[in-house]
Each structure stands twice: as C-alpha cells, then as structure tokens.
Design a protein with these regions (language model features):
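C-terminal structural segments of small proteins and small subunits
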Residues: 55-85
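Short cysteine-rich loop/turn motifs with clustered Cys
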Residues: 6-17
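Short linker/helix segments within small regulatory modules
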Residues: 30-42
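Cys/His-coordinated zinc-binding microdomains
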Residues: 13, 49-54
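Short metal-coordination and nucleic-acid-contact micro-motifs, chiefly zinc-binding Cys/His arrays
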Residues: 5-8, 41-44
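Short, non-ligating residues that shape and space the ligands of small metal-coordination modules
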Residues: 18-22, 54
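Flexible extramembrane loops and terminal tails that flank transmembrane helices
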Residues: 1-2
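Short acidic-glycine loop/turn motifs at beta-strand connectors
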Residues: 27-29, 49
C-alpha cells in the first residue's frame, strides 16, 4: 500500500500530488527559498506548477500569507522560468 503525498496549493487551494507543486520553504534567517528537492527543513508552502496559479499567488500574496513572511519577486520569476523552459 503506497502512501499518497497530497498537498494544498496556496493559490487555488486544490489538493494535488506533491510532485505537481513547487515548494517554497522559509529557512533559517527568514529567507524564503525555492525547494526543488522537497527536502529542505523549514516551514513550507506549495503552489501549482502553472503560470495562472503563480500569477494569482503573486496578486493575492498567498505565499506570503502561508509563510507569514514576504516572498521576493525573484522566486516568482524563477518558478515562471522553470515552467517556460
């Protein structure tokens, strides 16, 4: 029996498999970082790997709300860059 790894997107609030989401983690020193390995320790928030969720998340500040900390534009740009190739 395999264990499912479902997480909720901070933007659209849908439950999805962990692999379908980006993880942003708040590491020591209160610095948000994109965690592509899903293994960095710290408070994490998830957002879908599509441009609509990223745009909505930026507009609604959903990642900031989930992490209780500001998230820099560079992280959103990095996620968009990964999606667009």
């Amino acid at each position: 029996m395999s264990k499912e790894h479902k997480r909720m997107c901070s933007s659209c609030r849908q439950m999805k498999d962990k692999e379908e989401l980006f993880r942003i983690v708040l590491v020591k020193g209160n610095e948000p970082k994109l965690d592509l390995s899903y293994k960095i320790q710290g408070r994490g928030a998830y957002i879908c790997k599509n441009t609509e969720c990223i745009k909505t998340g930026l507009k609604k500040h959903s990642l900031e709300r989930s992490l209780s900390h500001s998230v820099k534009q560079e992280i959103y740009d990095e996620m968009s860059g990964i999606i667009n190739g």
